[in-house]
């Protein structure tokens, strides 16, 4: 038997919002430690890694390891029926071919349940190597979302450059160019508004704006985002979900074509 209960269904809704533009289907791997999802996006350009720890749920029971393949479009249709303040419970029997979502209103006057067929997804598990990053940037997630949205109006690619002076985001296209520079905040009362840069050596890499904008769909999950960069390895964009886990996106840098 598998059962996981969240006091607020809004977390589940936000997690789905953060991945459904990249994935049409995914396997949720459940064990004693919690729920994990790891998958390449539909175009095999980026990788999504989600961890929801068992201790972050109001109730969590997993008698034996279970992998649940789900169509995220179908799951999205079901989650629409949950009020943001409803509790959400996910249940499945061992070796079941369906999963049940139960939503309860705060006063328990309304209880609704929805059953969804599970899918057999033969997806390979990708090992993510441990990497030491040359540059780590922590900044407000809403600011990062705004920069990605604004600069994508100028070009399809965005250059992220990290130096001891700060971090610079730039894009160039037919209408011109745009640059946004952020310096490390000297002191700030609210931690979530801080810009913190840890740098071993300067890094400048180019990424597809389209995917960065997909990643910022996770903005509502966390007030801060962390960007980790090193030359020639994928960028990691991490949103920590308070009290329960994190979602990480990996995106390989674009290789700049030499002018012929």
Swiss-Prot record:
Entry's localization field: Nucleus
UniProt KW keywords: DNA replication, DNA-binding, Nucleus
A GO molecular-function annotation: DNA binding
Annotated region of DNA binding: 61-80
SUPFAM superfamilies with a match to the protein in the record: DNA clamp (SSF55979)
InterPro entries: DNA_clamp_sf, Pr_cel_nuc_antig, Pr_cel_nuc_antig_C, Pr_cel_nuc_antig_CS, Pr_cel_nuc_antig_N
GO cellular component terms attached to this protein's record: PCNA complex
Biological processes per GO annotation: leading strand elongation; mismatch repair; regulation of DNA replication; translesion synthesis
Domain of life of the native organism: Eukaryota
The keyword Nucleus appears for this protein: yes
Pfam families: PCNA_C (PF02747), PCNA_N (PF00705)
Function: This protein is an auxiliary protein of DNA polymerase delta and is involved in the control of eukaryotic DNA replication by increasing the polymerase's processibility during elongation of the leading strand.
Assembly: Homotrimer. Forms a complex with activator 1 heteropentamer in the presence of ATP.
NCBIfam families: pcna
Similarity section: Belongs to the PCNA family.
Name the record gives this protein: Proliferating cell nuclear antigen
Organism (species): Bombyx mori
């Amino acid at each position: 038997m598998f059962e996981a209960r969240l006091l607020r269904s809004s977390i589940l809704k936000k997690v789905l919002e953060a991945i459904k533009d990249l994935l049409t289907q995914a396997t949720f791997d459940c064990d004693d430690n919690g729920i994990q999802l790891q998958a390449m996006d539909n175009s095999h350009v980026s990788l999504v890694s989600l961890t929801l720890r068992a201790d972050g749920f109001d109730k969590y029971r997993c008698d034996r390891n279970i992998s649940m393949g789900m169509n995220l479009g179908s799951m999205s249709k079901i989650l629409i029926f949950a009020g943001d303040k409803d509790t959400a419970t996910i249940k499945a029997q061992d070796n079941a071919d369906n999963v049940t979502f139960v939503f309860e209103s705060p006063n328990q006057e309304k209880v609704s349940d929805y059953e969804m067929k599970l899918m057999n997804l033969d997806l390979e598990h990708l090992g993510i190597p441990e990497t030491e990053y040359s540059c780590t940037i922590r900044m407000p997630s809403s600011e990062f979302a705004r920069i990605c949205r604004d600069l994508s109006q100028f070009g399809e690619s965005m250059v992220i450059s990290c130096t001891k002076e700060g971090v610079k985001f730039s894009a160039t296209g037919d209408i011109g160019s745009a640059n946004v520079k952020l310096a490390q905040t000297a002191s700030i009362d609210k931690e979530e508004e801080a810009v913190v840069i840890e740098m071993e050596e300067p890094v400048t890499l180019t990424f597809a704006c389209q995917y960065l904008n997909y990643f910022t769909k996770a903005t509502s999950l966390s007030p801060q985002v962390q960007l980790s960069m090193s030359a020639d390895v994928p960028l990691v964009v991490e949103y920590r979900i308070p009290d329960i886990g994190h979602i990480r996106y990996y995106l390989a840098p674009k290789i700049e074509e030499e002018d012929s």
